[in-house]
């Protein structure tokens, strides 16, 4: 009887550990919560945007800010409070992300190509605690012309020459 209880408890412990390992493995797959807005004028061929990532931890990898900046320029678009202008998403809409999911999975993986199109302006991150979450902000320059050319050459979006 005692041997059966030990085996039963052992199986329960193994099952619980397996569940926690699986949950931990998918923690990085969670969609990012972020906001993006225009921050001013960048050099020709770039957008200057302020990205705010909303998460439970106060520490953030700089690459996550860059990823959100490129993702926001591609699929969300942004508006500027100062110039009262709106930039449409470079890729057109979120449907493009779903249609070309294989391409964007590789593009946005850790250390993926997206990193070539975003540069942090300054070294500092602004961290503000609001309730149980942190809002971590930074200004990022996104190379929109180079990003556009990359997507056209990959066949993700149609270039201007194809429309006429």
Each model region followed by its residue ranges:
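N-terminal signal peptide c-region/cleavage motif recognized by signal peptidases
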Residues: 22-23
